[in-house]
Amino acid sequence: MVSKSLIVLLLVSVLVSTFYTSEAYPASFDDDFDALDDLDDLDLDDLLDLEPADLVLLDMWANMLDSQDFEDDFE
């Protein structure tokens, strides 16, 4: 009986967290596969509108593309 209650509670918590994630990050559920193309189209105004966390992610992405290990994976 306790295990069934625990499973139901876990399932409800997963559903609730999924709902809040879709509210916080709606673009992740909109089938937006052109994100890399959008990065190529950034101009100065777009860069000034970015949040600090976005800049950190862009920096991490650029470092990943520059790393030798990443290039070796696709040769």
UniProtKB/Swiss-Prot annotation:
The record's GO CC annotations read: extracellular region
Tissues expressing the protein: Expressed by the venom gland.
Q: Where does it reside?
A: Secreted
Domain of life, per UniProt, equals Eukaryota
Main localization, broad class = secreted
Q: Among its keywords, does the record have Secreted?
A: yes
For this UniProt record, give its keywords in alphabetical order, as a comma-separated list: Secreted, Signal
Q: Which residues form the signal peptide?
A: 1-24
Family to which the UniProt record says this protein belongs: Belongs to the non-disulfide-bridged peptide (NDBP) superfamily.
The identity of this protein, by name, is: Anionic peptide
Name its species.
Tityus discrepans (Venezuelan scorpion)
